[in-house]
Each structure stands twice: as C-alpha cells, then as structure tokens.
C-alpha cells in the first residue's frame, strides 16, 4: 500500500503558499473591483480614496476576530450607526479580495500543468461543444449510461478543512471560516430555492470558487479510483481519503457489497468507463455489464457520504441502456440508435445484398423545455402560440427586429449540431411571429395589415440558415462536401450554457 501514497500525497511545495498577506494588498482589491464591483458605487458609498477604503477593510477584519461583533453582527441592521457604512458592501469587498487571493495558487497550478502537458492552445478545449464530438466518437460503442447529479450542500467546515490541505496558511482560513459563518448563506448558492440571499447575488465569484473547489476535490478522488481500480482491494484499502495521512475512514466501503458478495470485495477493472461533467451534472457511461455500473454508483454514493458527509439519494441515479433511453445533457436529448445501411456487392455473375447495422449518436433539440422557456420570457403561451412582447414595444423597429434576430442566431448557433432541425425551425417560427405581433402592436395594427404594408421580406433573415451560408461558400465544391456542411456542426467558440 505504500506505493499508492505517491499518487495520493500532496505536493509539499504547495504548503508554502501564504495568502493572508495578499488580502492587505491594494492591487488585490483593485483586481476585485475590476472583476465584480463598480468603482463609482464604491466611491459613492465610502466617500474615501482607495487607501482609506482599504484601511476600513483592515479594521473590519480586525473587528471580526473580536468576540463582541459590535459592527458586523448578523442581528444588526445592514447599516451600523457606529460606522455608518453598508455591511453588505464591505462583505462584498472582503469576499472579492478573498476570492482573488485564493484563486492565485490554483491559477498557477493550472498554468504549470498545461506547460508540463505541453498544451499550448487550450482555447478550443474550453468550449462546451467540444463534448459532443467526444460523445459521437465514444458513445456508439458503449452500452449503459447513468445521469449523476453531484449532491450538495457540503458542510462549511468540511469544505474549509479540505481547502486547507491544498494551501497551508492557517491565518487565511481562520479568516475564511469566520467570514463564511458571519456573512454567508452558503446553502443559498447551490440549494434550489426561489429566494436567493443578497450575499449570493453580490458575491457569486467567491461562492462559485468554493463550489468548484468542492467538485474538483471530489473528481480528483474519483479519477484516482478510476485509474487505480484494478490494483486496490476493499479489505485493505486504508489509504484513500485523509489528504494528509491517508490511513483511516475506509471501513465504510466494505459495506458496499458485503451483504450480497461477502467473499468478492475486489475492485473490478473497468477500462471503458467514461466520465463527463458540466457544472453540477455529470454523465457516467460504460461498455461493460450493469453490475459494474452499479458498482461505480455505490462507490460514488459512499464517497460523498463517508468523505464529504453529503447525503445522496441512490434512487435518483438511474442506469439505462443507451439504445433504449435518452440522456439530457447541455440542452440536448442524446441517444444511440441503429442506423441500417444496405450495401450491394457483385462477384462475377452473382450479386449480394448485405445489410449492416451501424450505431449512431442522435442529438435532438428538447422542444418542450424550449417552448416553456419562451413562454416564461413572454414570447408565446404555454401551448407554443406566439404572442407579442409588449415590454419591447417602446423600442425602435430596428431594435425590436435586431433583438429577435439575435435570439434566433444564438439558438441556431447552439443547436446547429442537432440531428433533426425541425424543432429549431418551429422555435424560429414562434420568434418570427412574436416579432411581427410586437411590431404590429407598436404601430396599432394587425399582423395581416402590417405584413401587407411592409412585405414579408422584412423578416426573411429569420429563416437564413447557417448551412445555407456554407452552401453559398462551397457552391463550386463537390456534392459530398456540400452534404457534409448540411449536417451537424459543432462550434468551438461557445463557453457557456444558459438554462
């Protein structure tokens, strides 16, 4: 077991990253202002220059360490008469400074890892559309898929202790713990509630960093299990989790298959397991039997419960066959279907007809969720019937048309990788009629009269498809090349997906 400590132990060079002095540097708060704060609002609220503002922040941090929270008690109002300053504003200042400070060592590690791996151009790898070519290449050869929702929320104390294993700076994390318990409603960031706290809205960068770190820690352990699974046994695997000594807290894993398989407690080799994640949702896919998928399911559940002390619901993790079920990921419904192809071959005077069944990944636009989103944005009703957008009726005709066209371009750009474009045409048709009704409402006219007066050419851009542009560019090319550009196209310039 000593050989595996090499893979688990922490790089000792990271222990010398002291962050506490950075919190009291002017340029850290300047970076924070550039990222998340409005300097004019700061000047308006503070009435001081930058040095005086930083001095007040230092005094606030000093006051946080005192037992009598005279200034920043949660029971007090947002504005304390002793100081006369907004508590939420200063919590935002400190959180932005903490976020910038803590991100520095992780950014340096990321840059060094890219240099060691000799990855010079990683820009395209950041695109979320780069996931789908991976699906097209791997998933037709896989059999089972499982949707895994990463459980939350993790306890603050567990999160801070885990963070301390990476950066050995006790002062910073004493301040971090005190600040989180004093100001933050950590659950409000990642708990699906209608009401989001003021802190979550004004400090998304800081809390998103904490959540992403939790996911990164979970994935580092999961990938270790994935890469070393063929060499470890559950009966003697006391080296997993404590990120300093790694020799404790593993007896819970013995209970995974202890009841059904008391004599078979080995990790099974699974070279075909694939893992993909975006934000809090991940996909596990494998070529092997459902038993191995079930094994990984219970490993993850025990990992969350025993190491992170996060409750996970096993009943919500379903294992499905790719050929029979679709999985929802990044706004697409994807499944693997059989694509029959008939090949006729002739040998001398005899001809043969051979039928081959090829597996192909289908990516389908989820029409019903999109219509619900359009209905929520007041472009149509719940049945998909277009309605006018009265909020935009005060804008100019050019601005109204440009807004609708921009939405259509974004949807077409993102969903151009769909196998079936009819759903996209329907969405664009809804937006087209909604635009016409909005213009008619503005001019106090009917849709028919408005179109008759201006002509249907006014909105013909709604149906200008990107593949038509490609066909114009490659008009002299071969028919095979034209057919290629009429198919699915994945763009590597899309870095975010808004629900």
Swiss-Prot record:
Principal localisation: plastid
Pfam families named in the record: Intron_maturas2, MatK_N
Annotated GO MF terms: RNA binding
Biological processes annotated in GO: mRNA processing; RNA splicing; tRNA processing
Superkingdom assignment: Eukaryota
InterPro entries in the record: Domain_X, Maturase_MatK, Maturase_MatK_N
Record keyword Chloroplast present: yes
Record's subcellular location: Plastid, Chloroplast
Keywords: Chloroplast, mRNA processing, Plastid, RNA-binding, tRNA processing
One Gene Ontology cellular component annotation held by this UniProt entry: chloroplast
Function: Usually encoded in the trnK tRNA gene intron. Probably assists in splicing its own and other chloroplast group II introns.
Family, as annotated: Belongs to the intron maturase 2 family. MatK subfamily.
Annotated protein name in UniProt: Maturase K
Organism: Albizia julibrissin (Silk tree)
Gene name in the database record: matK
């Amino acid at each position: 077991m000593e050989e595996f400590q090499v893979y688990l132990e922490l790089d000792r060079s990271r222990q010398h990253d002291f962050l506490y002095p950075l919190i009291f540097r002017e340029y850290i708060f300047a970076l924070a202002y550039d990222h998340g704060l409005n300097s004019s609002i700061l000047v308006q609220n503070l009435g001081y220059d930058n040095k005086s503002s930083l001095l007040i922040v230092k005094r606030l941090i000093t006051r946080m360490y005192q037992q009598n929270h005279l200034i920043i008690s949660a029971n007090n109002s947002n504005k304390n008469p002793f100081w006369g300053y907004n508590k939420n504003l200063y919590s935002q200042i400190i959180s932005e400074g903490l976020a910038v400070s803590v991100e520095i060592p992780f950014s340096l590690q990321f840059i060094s890892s890219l240099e060691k791996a000799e990855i010079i151009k990683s820009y395209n790898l950041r695109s979320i559309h780069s996931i789908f070519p991976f699906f097209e290449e791997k998933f037709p050869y896989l059999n089972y898929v499982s949707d895994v929702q990463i459980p939350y929320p993790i306890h603050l104390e567990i999160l801070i202790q885990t963070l301390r294993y990476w950066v050995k700076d006790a002062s910073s994390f004493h301040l971090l713990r005190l600040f989180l318990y004093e100001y933050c409603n950590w659950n409000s960031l990642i708990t699906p509630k209608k009401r989001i706290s003021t802190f979550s809205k004004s400090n998304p960068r800081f809390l998103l960093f904490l959540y992403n770190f939790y996911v990164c820690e979970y994935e580092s352990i999961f990938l270790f299990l994935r890469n070393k699974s063929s060499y470890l046994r559950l009966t003697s695997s006391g080296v997993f989790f404590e990120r300093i000594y790694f020799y404790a807290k593993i007896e819970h894993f013995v209970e995974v298959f202890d009841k059904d398989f008391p004599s078979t407690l080995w990790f099974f080799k699974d070279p075909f397991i694939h893992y993909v994640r975006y934000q809090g949702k991940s996909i596990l896919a494998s070529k092997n039997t459902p038993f191995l998928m079930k094994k990984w399911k219970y490993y993850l559940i025990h990992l969350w419960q025993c190491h992170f002390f996060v409750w996970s619901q096993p009943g919500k993790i379903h294992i499905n066959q790719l050929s029979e079920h679709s999985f929802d990921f990044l706004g697409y419904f994807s499944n693997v279907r059989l694509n029959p192809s008939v090949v006729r071959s002739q040998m001398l005077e005899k001809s043969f007809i051979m039928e081959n069944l090829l597996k192909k990944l289908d990516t389908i636009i989820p029409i019903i969720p999109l219509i619900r989103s359009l209905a929520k944005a007041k472009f149509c009703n719940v049945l998909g019937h277009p309605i006018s957008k009265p909020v935009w009726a005060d804008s100019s005709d050019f601005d109204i048309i440009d807004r609708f066209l921009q939405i259509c371009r974004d949807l077409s750009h993102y969903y151009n990788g769909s196998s079936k474009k009819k759903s996209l045409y329907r969405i664009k048709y809804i937006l087209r009629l909604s635009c016409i009704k909005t213009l008619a409402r503005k001019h106090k006219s009917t849709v028919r009269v408005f179109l008759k007066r201006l002509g249907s050419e006014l909105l013909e851009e709604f149906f200008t498809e990107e593949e038509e542009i490609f066909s114009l560019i490659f008009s002299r090319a071969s028919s095979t090349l034209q057919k290629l550009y009429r198919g699915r196209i994945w763009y590597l310039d899309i870095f975010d997906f808004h629900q």
